[in-house]
Amino acid sequence: PRIDALDFSLEWARFNPAAAKFPKGATHFELLYCLLVYDAATNTFVTYEAPILRRSKEDRSERLVQTLEGGPTKEEGLQYIPVLGLRFMEVLGEEEYANFGKDAVGIEVLGML
C-alpha cells in the first residue's frame, strides 16, 4: 500500500481480499489501520485509527483508501508509525465466530515516517 505523506491516508490501487491466506474455517477478516505518533520529548504516544474494514474471501479486487479519524498532521520532531492489524473470523448468517487458529490474527508495522 501507499501512505500519503500529508494526511497519512493508506491507499491500495488493487486490494484483493481473496489473495489473503484464510485460516481454516475463516470466511471474513477485519482490517484495522492505525497510526502511532510518538513524541520523544514527552515520551508519549497518540493513536489515530481508520474505521475497521470487513471483507469476505468472496469479495472482489477494489481500490481501497483508508483515512484516519481525527486528522493527524505532520509535525517536526515527532515519529509516525503506521500499523495494520488483521483478524480472521467465520460469519454464518447473523452469527460471528472469532477464529483463534494459527495465523488468525496479525499485526504489521509498515515502517516509520
Locate the predicted segments by residue:
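Long amphipathic N-terminal alpha/beta scaffold segment
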Residues: 1-5
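Intrinsically disordered, low-complexity Ser/Thr/Gly-rich stretches
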Residues: 36-54
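Structural beta-strand segments of beta-rich domains
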Residues: 6-10
